[in-house]
Curated annotation (Swiss-Prot):
Descriptive protein name: Long form salivary protein D7L2
Key word Protease present: no
CDD domains documented for this protein: PBP_GOBP
Keywords, sorted A to Z: Disulfide bond, Hemostasis impairing toxin, Platelet aggregation inhibiting toxin, Secreted, Signal, Toxin, Vasoactive, Vasodilator
Keyword Iron-sulfur: no
Tissues expressed in: Saliva (at protein level). Female salivary gland (at protein level). Detected in the head and thorax of the female mosquitoes, where the salivary glands are located.
Phenotype upon gene inactivation: Mosquitoes show longer probing times when fed on mouse or chicken but not when using an artificial membrane feeder or mice deficient in leukotrienes. Reduced blood-feeding success, defined as the percentage of engorged mosquitoes after a fixed amount of time, when fed on vertebrate hosts. (Microbial infection) Significant reduction in the numbers of oocysts in the mosquito midgut after infection with Plasmodium gallinaceum, the causative agent of avian malaria.
Induction summary: (Microbial infection) Up-regulated in salivary glands following dengue virus type 2 infection.
Gene Ontology CC terms: extracellular space
Assembly and interaction partners: Interacts with human CD4.
Length: 332
């Protein structure tokens, strides 16, 4: 046992380490959580033994069938992308559970004591032998069985909490059923602003300039996850959009490798513009990129549309019409 003074000092040091480490992870807002869960569902439900049944379970916050590898890997995917599980450490991160609650507690219907219990439960799980889907799932299943309501609450899984957050943040966050592009346009080219006159050309792939355009491209590239929060390029995310419209991403990937190597900018907005120019200026890539970019605008309205059957099979002409309709609104 620690003597009282040493115990207090040790507790202070541990608390300080937790505080120091906290900024390395950012709590997740409803928009981020919707993106994470929908993306993990897209990746894993087709691999389930009964895809339709598994998807319905996951949409209802039920991690079933528990013996299906797809369910196990979906769970691991969500936990890793949120940050509640760190594969490199093979550990669950209880401190992040509390950080999630502390960041958003005024919106959440979650009791602090229950959140504290969940935090402690995570922290008491020893490092796993591996970060396999089955091992992560088995460890989490025991926690979820006892704390499922609290987990759902801190992850904005109850409608009223996310509704309050969206209402308070307004134009500062992409709203449900709002395309990511229109969100960024409302922030950077709002109606009545002097720069609004530039928006129509930008929507039609004319290159903008200045700090407003830089902020706009940063908003879009980070919102689409083409760039990470640390300003790193995620070329696989761009490739994913190419594949969805049945375009091969190989030429784009090779070109973007060179583009990244030539990057000299440090400012996030300038970095986004640099990457955008590369995609627009390469004659072998630009037409496919525009097609992929247009469809991503349409799909960004509802992250769950492809999962719930609301998204029609891809048709270039249908997408072009939808984008033209948006242009009419934004160019007026």
């Amino acid at each position: 046992m620690f003597p009282p003074r040493k115990f207090l000092l040790s507790s202070f040091i541990l608390a300080a380490l937790h505080v120091t480490a906290a900024p390395l992870w950012d709590a997740k807002d409803p928009e981020q959580l919707r993106f994470i869960t929908s993306r993990c569902m897209e990746d894993w439900y087709p691999k389930a033994k009964n895809p339709k049944a598994a998807l319905q379970n996951w949409l209802g916050w039920k991690l079933e069938p528990s013996d299906d590898q797809a369910t196990q890997c979906y769970t691991k995917c969500v936990l890793e992308k949120i940050g509640f599980y760190e594969p490199g450490e093979k550990r669950f991160k209880g401190v992040r559970v509390m950080q999630q609650w502390e960041t958003f507690h005024k919106y959440l219907n979650a009791d602090r004591e229950k959140v504290h219990d969940l935090t402690s439960t995570f922290d008491f799980i020893p490092p796993l032998k591996s970060s396999s889907c089955s091992e992560v799932f088995e460890a989490f299943k025991k926690v979820n069985g006892k704390h499922s309501e609290t987990i759902r609450a801190i992850l904005f899984g109850k409608g009223e909490s996310s509704k309050k957050y969206y209402q308070e943040k307004g134009v500062k966050i992409k709203q449900k059923e709002q395309s990511l592009f229109m969100h960024c346009e409302a922030l950077n080219y709002p109606k009545g602003s002097p720069q609004r006159k530039d928006l129509c050309g930008i929507r039609k792939y004319q290159m903008g300039s200045g700090i407003v355009f830089e902020r706009h491209m940063e908003c879009i590239f980070k919102g689409l996850r083409y760039m990470t929060s640390k300003n790193e390029l995620d070329v696989d995310e761009i490739a994913r959009d190419f594949i969805v419209v049945k375009k091969k991403p190989d030429a784009m990937k090779a070109m973007m490798k060179t583009c990244k190597a030539n990057l000299k900018e440090k400012n996030p907005g300038k970095i986004a513009v640099h990457y955008y120019k590369c995609l627009m200026n390469d004659s072998k890539v630009t037409n496919d990129f525009k097609e992929a970019f247009d469809y991503r605008e349409v799909r960004s309205k509802d992250y769950f549309a492809a999962l719930t059957g609301k998204l029609k099979p891809y048709s270039r002409s249908d997408v072009r019409k939808q984008v033209d309709d948006i242009d009419k609104i934004q160019c007026s």
